[in-house]
Amino acid sequence: MAESILDRTINRFWYKLGDDCLSESQFDLMIRLMEESLDGDQIIDLTSLPSDNLQVEQVMTTTEDSISEEESEFLLAIGETSEEESDSGEEPEFEQVRMDRTGGTEIPKEEDGGEPSRYNERKRKTTEDRYFPTQPKTIPGQKQTTMGMLNIDCQANRRTLIDDWAAEIGLIVKTNREDYLDPETILLLMEHKTSGIAKELIRNTRWNRTTGDIIEQVIDAMYTMFLGLNYSDNKVAEKIEEQEKAKIRMTKLQLCDICYLEEFTCDYEKNMYKTELADFPGYINQYLSKIPIIGEKALTRFRHEANGTSIYSLGFAAKIVKEELSKICDLTKKQKKLKKFNKKCCSIGEASVEYGCKKTSKKKYHKRYKKKYKAYKPYKKKKKFRSGKYFKPKEKKGSKQKYCPKGKKDCRCWICNIEGHYANECPNRQSSEKAHILQQAEKLGLQPIEEPYEGVQEVFILEYKEEEEETSTEEDDGSSTSEDSDSESD
C-alpha cells in the first residue's frame, strides 16, 4: 500500500509538470527540490525554473492541508512501524527509490512467475520508445554485391560488368607485378573475384599458360560464351562488324522533338566512339544536320569556331547547340513580353512621321471561356427495380363486337337490304367487285331485286322490245351493205 500511494503522488507530480519539456539541468534541479520538500515545511517557488514550456500555477507547500486522507493514514502507519522497530532495537531498513525522467520510480523486478505489475501498464512512453520512420539504406529486392566481384547470372548489362571487372583485375596485376608473375596466381585471383557461371567457366576450362596473356584469354572466352562475340578466334572481324552496325544506327537516328536532345546526343555519341577517330569530323557534321530549327546555324558556327582537337569533339558541337537553343528561348520570352507592351509609349522616343494615314483596325473577337461549373445540377434519384416495367405480359386481343350507333343491331345491310347484320357479315356477299357495283347502283337510285341473279352482267338488264327491234334492223342493214361492197369489189 505504501508503494502504491508513493508511486501515485510522484506520477501525478510528473504528469502535471510535463516531463517531456524538461532538460537535464531542469531535471536535476527538480530532484533536488523534491528532496528538500520532503524534509520539512519548506515553501518552494517553482516559477524560478528556467523553462519557457514549464508553467506552474501554484506554489507548492507541504502543509497539513494539502495532504489527503489516504496520505495521512500512510504517514501514520509509517510512524507506528518506525516506533515498533525502535523499541525492538533493530535498525529500520529503508528501500531506496530512484527517480527517473520517465515520470515514475524504478521498482525492483518481480520474480519469475509473478503477475505483471501495474507500474508497467501505467508507464509513460519516452522519446526513445517512439517510432520514427527512416529511409532504408538499400532498396528492397536489389542485390548488392561486393566491390570487384563479377556475377553475371541473369543480368542484362553483361558487357558492362565484364569490362569493369577486367579493368579492375588488370589494375591489381599491374600494380603488384611481383605477386602475380605466375599465371596460376592470376587465375586464382580471377576465380576468387567471380561467382556463378563466370566462376565455373574459369575453373573448368583448360587455359594455355605458356603463351599469351592469361587475362586476355579469359576475357575473350567470356565475350564468346556469354555475349556471343567470337573474340577468341576472330577479334578483328567482330570489331569491324560492330563498327558497321554503329554507322548504320547513326544514319538511322532522327530527332523530331528538340526536347529529346540529351537522349539523342547520348545514343549518337555512344555509337560514334565505336568507329575510327579519323571519321569523327564527318559524323559530327551529320549530327548537327539532324537537329531541327537550330542545326544549320550550329553547323556554320562549328565550321568557323572549331580548330585543332575541337574538330574531333562531339561535346563542343553539343555545347554550340545548347547555346543556340538558349538564344531561341530568350527570344520567345521577349516576344511574350512585347505582347504586353503598350504602343502608346512609342511617341515618347520620336515624333510620328505619318500624317493623315488611316490605321488599319482589326476586328476583335471575344474569346468564349468555358464555364467551370454547370448551370444546373442534375437530381439523381435511386431507381427501384420494378418487374412489371420491363416484363409486362401481352394483352390478348380478341374479336370485339361492333355496335350500331344506337347500341343495337337494327341497321340494314346494303347488300341484301335486310336488318340484323352488317354488309361484311352478309351471307349473300360473294366478292368485293360485286359490292363495288352495288355501291354505284345505289348512288344512281337503283335498288336490288328480291331474287338476285347469278351473273354480274345479268343484274341490271332492261327489257325494252322497241330498242331490240331497232338494234336488229341496224344489224341486218349492216350485213347487207357489207355484202354489196364485197360483190362490187369482185
Curated annotation (Swiss-Prot):
GO cellular component terms listed in the entry, alphabetical order: host cell; host cell nucleus; T=7 icosahedral viral capsid
GO molecular function, one term: structural molecule activity
Motif Nuclear localization signal per UniProt: ranges: 122-125
Biased composition (Basic and acidic residues): 95-111
GO annotation terms (biological process): symbiont entry into host cell; viral penetration into host nucleus
Zinc finger feature spans (CCHC-type): 411-428
Keyword Translocase: no
Annotated keywords: Capsid protein, Host nucleus, Metal-binding, T=7 icosahedral capsid protein, Viral penetration into host nucleus, Virion, Virus entry into host cell, Zinc, Zinc-finger
Ranges of compositional bias, category Acidic residues: 81-94, 465-490
Similarity comment: Belongs to the caulimoviridae capsid protein family.
Oligomeric and partner information: Interacts (via nuclear localization signal) with host importin alpha.
Role played: Self assembles to form an icosahedral capsid, about 50 nm in diameter, nm, composed of 420 subunits of the viral capsid protein. The capsid encapsulates the genomic dsDNA. Following virus entry into host cell, provides nuclear import of the viral genome. Virus particles do not enter the nucleus, but dock at the nuclear membrane through the interaction with host importins.
Protein name: Capsid protein
Organism for this UniProt entry: Cauliflower mosaic virus (strain D/H)
